[in-house]
Amino acid sequence: PWSRDQRALRARATYLHQTLGGDDWPDLSDTALKQNSDWLAPHLLGETRLSAITAEHLGAALDTILPWSRRQEIDLLLPSHFTAPSGSHVPIDYAAENGPALEIRVQELFGLDRHPSVAGGRIPLLLILLSPAHRPIQTTRDLPGFWRGSWKDVAKDLKGRYPRHVWPEDPAAAAAVTRAVVRSAVVGGAVGLAASAA
């Protein structure tokens, strides 16, 4: 019965083990943990049934394998969340099949002119860009290239489906949007910002 946070921590540690650290980081995959129960046994003293194992038991075992100092290292290398230009903190999926992935509404990335990455810039995130209705519209590992390339066609389609939203010609220079807004209000705000910057 792993908690969601425990599963996320295991995924990050396992990704480090498989991709960056080798033996410097423990393999916390299901396969590795099932092969050796020594990591859990000391935390089950007095328990006689498997059904008695709780997230607290598993958490205590994780604390032994990954003490606080090591978790801080993980947080630096592989943060659990990405802070978008919109201000949202979006969880990164390190257990995704094609490497660390981020599902995010495309509007929350307006204003970003570089591709998000982890591990000190060594690993680009797979961006799964979503519509305002949280439906996938595109995947990319090159956000600047997407803005310069296929964004024009994607934006044209989005304008037809979501006319109340603003779909800028140059999203890398636009302001990020966190929620649905009336088109005229955003356009007016953009004009005001442009005037004040001039």
Where are these regions (language model features)?
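Acidic, serine/threonine- and proline-rich low-complexity intrinsically disordered segments
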Residues: 1-77, 81, 122-198
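Aromatic-enriched hydrophobic runs in primary sequence
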Residues: 39, 91-92, 117, 147
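Amphipathic alpha-helical packing elements
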Residues: 74-106
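Short, surface-exposed, low-complexity cationic segments
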Residues: 95-125, 129
